[in-house]
Amino acid sequence: INGEVVAENQKSKLKSQKAGTVNKFSCSPKVEEDFKTEFAGEKEIPVIQALDGQLITNRLDLVPKADNGKIVSDTENDVLKIVVVNRYQEAPVAKAFIKGFGLKQGALASSVAHDSHNIVAVGVDEESLCRAVNLVIAEQGGLSAVGNGRELVLGLPVAGLMSNGDGYEIAEAYTRLDQFTKKDLGSTLTSPFMTLSFMALLVIPHLKLSDKGLFDGDVF
């Protein structure tokens, strides 16, 4: 009754309307030093164990790999650095270590990081982490991967979570990122960016990383 035809012959009759993008990115580019972790003689450190296809994680307590007074990634044992960068204000980078991503080189970063949607990144070294995070900051949100002499980034200008671009083009760009992360960087996860996006979600056990540091859901 008094209806309006909005689609016909598989084509929309609705007029497109442009809207401004909503976003908030108030962090400046980082430097490599921001991602370094001091070694204080720890015998063991808490390590997040990411599980393929799962939102939960396990806690492992492992012997850290130290080099020149710093705790560094141990790619031979798949213990990599994970960081969370506060995107809403200037703050120190939160750092920890994670097992299960399988990266042999480079880093990946994302501003899709439930629920606060800060920037979360995993990488084999501080230089790669810095590059990946700064790509996301430059785009004011998105997904990035660096390594093997290449840099890939998918900008997500709407709140750092979504794109206002063509859906098919965005899907192709995401597929390229996903394949690059697995084939070039060596990730063994089915969906590296999906797993990454839940590593800062504290309400799902057991060990996660927020912009304030590690959070153990079993003992808080």
Segment roles from a protein language model:
Residues 1-220:
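Active-site microenvironment of metallo-dependent hydrolases
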